[in-house]
């Protein structure tokens, strides 16, 4: 046990020292050298849940779903400044309360999709497990919009900058 504490402490001190950070010598490519770029968001979990709640097993959770939409709006604003080739969200776009209705859940999806639509370039979605809480796949597809010919699809591929992206 004492050996473990010593090793953990030593690693922490090493990370804080000037020798603890590895420098690869790599630099970011210039804008002219970038082949393709994209904005990426995942697990937004937009919902109006109390920050402190208990699940069916009585386990307490401290999650701040009510802050997710504003954080996502900031992420989209950052993407707008960087101007990537496209933006993609990788699932769990919304969440829902245990007692939530289909209409309430679709409303949450509409709100977070409206924030995503502030990105002026091509936008794509990957459906996550929470995206189907209280709604169907058809509901999800009807209230989100992939760009180009990927509208209404859950599996697709597209090419940007000579790179093929497969979803």
Positions of predicted regions on the chain:
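Short gly/ser/thr-rich secondary-structure transition/capping motifs
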Residues: 21-22, 70, 147-150
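N-terminal active-site segment of His-dependent metallophosphoesterases
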Residues: 25-102
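Residue-level detector of conserved, well-ordered beta-strand and adjacent loop positions
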Residues: 7, 42, 159
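N-terminal export signals
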Residues: 4-25
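Alpha-helix C-cap/termination motif
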Residues: 9, 13, 81-82, 118-119
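Extended active-site neighborhood of metal-dependent phosphoesterases/phosphodiesterases
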Residues: 28-30, 57-62, 98-167
